[in-house]
Amino acid sequence: MKIARVFPRKTSMSPTDALAFFGPPTIENIADCIKENVTEVHISVTFTWDIEKAEDLYYAWQILGVPVEVGGPAFDDRMGDFTPGLYLRDGMIFTSRGCTKDCWFCSVPRCAHGEIKELPIVDGWNILDDNILGTSEAHFRAVCDMLKRQKHRSVFTGGLEPALLQQWQADLLYEVKPARLYTAYDTRDDLEPLIEMGKKLRAAGFRPSSHTMCCYVLCGYDGDSFEDAEKRLVQTMQAGFVPYAMLFRGEDGKYDPEWRRFQREWCRPIITGKKFNEYWLAQNDT
């Protein structure tokens, strides 16, 4: 069975093989599918604001005359098995599904129901798990062992939950020598765990100057202000993490242009890295 995968938009995590397509079918796309004897078309939708576009793609790809299916995270399809390279670029992997938390701004709880499902561990270097620190000790150790074998330095893009990090996990992460690991500062309750996480990671051997420790900072939601958001971003630097502003977007994907401008000042690596370096240099001078 050969599956053509279709995506409403192309991202840095999209697969790059010959049967990964973006948008409506072109004559060349159709020819490629016929040549490869494609038997199914899967339209994968990550963002809810792309659902309408996916509906158009569903009808457009009927031209191949093979079954067309629509699914993906936008439809709360998050707890299934994982096949490397199918819907994500090679190297991007899930080793578990689900999360134990129930964050108001996140769609994962709708399908995870507070549970984490451990998956067979496959080779890869970019860990996308929603809550890998919530997996069993045996699973976490096995994932780290796998990462040590990879030629590419690992990245924990899915994020590490500050409140769950234990010192042995921090020590093991340091042994893996990741290029970057990400955590999140989403609500006020996250600050103290974030500070403690920074202490544990530094105790393990991580240094702020390496820019390995990174943190997504949610901003732009109802009731937020530029002053409060900037305060959280500074607090993130104080905890030892390079901050990256993450703009809140509702089900329709809309956002305030003013917040978008604010986010840009705090999401580009060159800018945030410079702000972070200036902050830590000032701290060392005092």
Where are these regions (language model features)?
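Short, acidic/polar
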Residues: P24-C33, L165-L173, F226-R232
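Core AdoMet radical
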Residues: R5, E40-T48, S107-L201, S210-D222, ...
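A short, structured N-terminal alpha-helical element that caps or precedes a catalytic domain
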Residues: M1-P67
